[in-house]
Amino acid sequence: MKNLPVYKHPASYAREHNELAAYRASNQANAACKEAIEAAIRDHYRDNRLDAAAVDQVVQQFGYDRTFHVLAITVCQADWDRRYSPDNRAWANAMSIPANSDAWGTDRNCYLAVNNHPGLVDLFLSQTRKAYAQEQQKTSVRDKLKKLPETTSPKISAKSKSPER
């Protein structure tokens, strides 16, 4: 499911553009990611501490893009809840998750919100964002190393044709 792209449009858009198959596949992967996040938090929360392995467990299976999408939906669905840090709330609102209303006016995104304690979800989100930033930094260092100019041997100057001592 890591290679399946996240469909970021509502069902109405998918219906109008004949993309319902992509929407449904992405929505199923989002629901599976939500369940994986809940299981990871449940399995890795011990002694008032959330192990960083929880993030690795989810990201290896779903990738950062889908994990961030589900976490942004979770925070945006509870924008009234101050147990999410202001930084994470601002990040989630910047993700611009569109409303996905059904025929009765219910936002379908509510079914994709993680159902763990908001403090633990906030901690999981912070750890995920930190892991992503570290991975991006590693990637940029690798790119810099690849782009280093090749060193060339120094050229002998035309003026220094005197014999060496």
Briefly describe each language-model feature range.
Residues 1-164:
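Gram-negative host-targeted secretion-system effectors, predominantly Type III and Type IV
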